[in-house]
């Protein structure tokens, strides 16, 4: 609400964080479009912005997503997960690795901090939010090896991420397969899981009556490489490639023309 996400400096104004107005926009003005409240990029030394977002989410009955800003010293995420957020609220950029700015899940000894598992069991949703600067194998690989897997795999698509290590959703899903997840698991975490989180059961599945958003992939076998935001590489043997995309039942992408007739067909 207010001036919105104009930039880092504008996002520091606590007086611009109005829970009642944010909830009003979510429930009365744009209920078909707004699926949650986001707290982002706040530099303050406390959880004021998060608490205001949670208040708005409570009034509107929608989840809250938290993207912690750069804090010096970093704010304690154990307190965030166990005292400030509600079950169903979301922490994004799960596998970012900037410990001087924000606390990370994996400690300096390569171990996932115990309260991370407690928070996930409590119902805190962990979101990848790869982006152009928020995904590092140094956090993701040991986390997954120890059983801490983000609930939602998301791209955070923008020009910085599409031209960096993220590239596109198919590449991102392939990256998680290279880290040990199954094809079925990555699809679930990119479709049905996020649909449930934002309370949109008509999305993310192919049930009768659901929105006809369909992605058809080919699964390539070979020698592939995947990079994080620091250009560190992980090797893999499988890669998904988007063949066909339908949005609301209409073809919007067809890589090899599989839905098209031959040019000389009669």
For each feature predicted by the language model, list its residue ranges:
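His/Asp/Glu-enriched, well-ordered alpha-helical/loop segment
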Residues: 138-221
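Residue "hotspots" at secondary-structure boundaries inside conserved domains
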Residues: 83, 198, 204-207, 237, ...
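Active-site metal-binding loops of divalent metal-dependent hydrolases
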Residues: 96, 131, 157
């Amino acid at each position: 609400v207010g001036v919105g996400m104009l930039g880092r400096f504008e996002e520091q104004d606590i007086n611009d964080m109005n829970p009642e107005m944010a909830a009003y926009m979510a429930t009365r003005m744009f209920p078909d479009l707004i699926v949650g409240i986001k707290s982002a990029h706040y530099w303050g030394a406390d959880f004021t912005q998060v608490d205001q977002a949670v208040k708005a989410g409570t009034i509107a009955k929608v989840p809250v997503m938290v993207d912690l800003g750069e804090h010096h010293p970093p704010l304690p995420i154990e307190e965030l997960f166990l005292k400030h957020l509600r079950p169903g609220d979301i922490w994004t950029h799960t596998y970012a690795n900037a410990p001087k700015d924000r606390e990370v899940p994996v400690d300096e000894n390569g171990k996932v901090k115990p309260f991370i598992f407690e928070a996930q069991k409590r119902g805190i949703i962990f979101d990848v939010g790869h982006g152009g600067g928020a995904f590092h194998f140094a956090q993701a690989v040991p986390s997954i090896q120890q059983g801490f897997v983000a609930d939602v795999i998301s791209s955070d698509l923008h020009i910085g991420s599409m031209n960096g290590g993220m590239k596109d959703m198919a590449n991102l899903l392939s990256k998680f397969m290279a880290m040990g997840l199954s094809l079925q698991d990555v699809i679930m975490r990119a479709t049905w899981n996020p649909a449930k989180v934002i309370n949109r059961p008509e999305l993310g599945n192919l049930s009768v009556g659901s929105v006809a958003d369909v992605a058809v992939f080919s699964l390539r076998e070979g020698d592939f490489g995947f990079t994080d935001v620091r250009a560190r590489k992980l090797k893999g043997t499988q890669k998904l490639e988007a063949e066909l995309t339908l949005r609301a039942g209409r073809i919007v992408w067809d890589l090899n023309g599989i839905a098209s007739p031959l040019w000389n067909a009669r």
